[in-house]
Amino acid sequence: IPGFFEPFKGADVYRAEDIPPLDVLLITHDHYDHLDYPTIAAIRSRVKRVVCPLGVGAHFEAWGYDPERITETVWYESVRLAPNLELTCLPSQHFSGRTMTMNTTLWAGFMFDIAGYKLYLSGDGGYGPHFKAVRDMCGRIDFAVLEDGQYNKEWSDIHLMPADWKLALTDIAPAVVMPCHNAKYALSRHVWTEPLTAALDNARSVRIPVTTPLIGSRIALADPAAAGKIWWPEKP
């Protein structure tokens, strides 16, 4: 986001041309760090289908995407993407908006049910009762992608502080967790490695395996924790 929020040094080596063809492009909300116009435009011919919260599809239509390829969802709505793949839109405690708009589109987390294998994407958001509600609604969660970066006490309602990340992790109790939202854009004042280190410590303290793969690497769902290792420096 030129002039406002820049990537951490070295975090922009993965570019649009590196993104492979996508069966489904899933967007959690329309903030610039999640919905980047140059990237979305560059991969348009490689995206078979877009799934996003209510209202976000208008951006894609304005940027030349076929409306027939766009599926908008609301909280607790499920969409079957394939015979053995169902996606459910779930609440998060966040907000939405771009330059001239605020909260005119929905924000969300999502649960993938892949033939009984449950993969949870929290989306952006602060701590709230929705985490336990997700667990109660969906049962066992095999893999969770849980946001853990760009936090600050001044906006703890919309991003998880490390202590709240641990609470959320305990609520959803996944078999394996992958922290995200931590090492791309400098939206807060912490050093870029701090969220990763805190997540690793917090996950270990509650005995939940944590995986921290490098961008672009593949994760085997049969053994997702195998992809994790400490690749960041102790002192950035």
Enumerate the predicted regions with their spans:
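Cap/insert and terminal regions of metallo-dependent hydrolase folds
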Residues: 24, 49, 55-58, 118, ...
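Conserved beta-strand hairpin/beta-sheet module of binuclear metal-dependent hydrolase folds
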Residues: 1-12, 103-123
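Short, surface-exposed connector motifs at secondary-structure boundaries
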Residues: 39-46, 113-119
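Pre-active-site segment of Zn-dependent metallo-hydrolases
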Residues: 1-30, 37-42, 52-55, 97, ...
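Metal-dependent catalytic neighborhoods of phosphoester/phosphodiester hydrolases
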Residues: 37-44, 187-197, 223
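Metallo-beta-lactamase
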Residues: 52-117, 198-216, 222-223
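Short, basic/aromatic-enriched C-terminal tail that caps enzymatic domains
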Residues: 217-236
